[in-house]
Amino acid sequence: MDFRAALEQLKAALQRPLPGAGAHRLTAPRPPRQWPAGFDQANIRHAAGLLLLFPVDDRAHIVLTVRADTLGRHGGQVSLPGGVVEPGETFEAAALREAQEEIGIASGPVRIVGALTPIDIPVSAFRLHPIVGAIDERPVMRPSDDEVAAILEVPVDRLLDPASLIETERLRIRHRFGLRSE
């Protein structure tokens, strides 16, 4: 998809009401994860991620990261560059700061286009606020070795192609334990 056309289409879509949880269900794990019984939602931690739109050979792309395996519960997962919102920080500022920390993108040339519906992540008690940004040229990206295993540049037309959306079942068993020496 042409970068300028994708950007205009996205701007127009962000002027309408967002589809919210219905859109999330299309790609959510089955069964969808819920907040644990008795969980006090006042304890939700807020995070922000940058959904950055940029051109590669005039085709619209977004950037995703593969998180370093050393990063707790979400290590090895594909994600938006992003992280915890610091006290007094806006979601937009947090998304830009985290993108700079994780993939080395300077925030100056990034234009904030809007925000998508927040996504709850019960396993780690986070609510992720996706912030949409755009930049007019392919950014130079350098992954933070501590946080990012790989940077993925994903063509938007692949994401919009129904043939790219496949349903799979995946089982991942992960257990950490420590060893003591005497």
Segments (PLM) and residue ranges:
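N-terminal leader/linker segments that precede catalytic domains of diphosphate-processing enzymes
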Residues: 1-79, 84-101, 105-139, 148, ...
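Acidic, glycine-rich loop-and-strand cores that form catalytic or ligand-binding grooves
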Residues: 141-167
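Acidic, negatively charged sequence signal
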Residues: 165-176
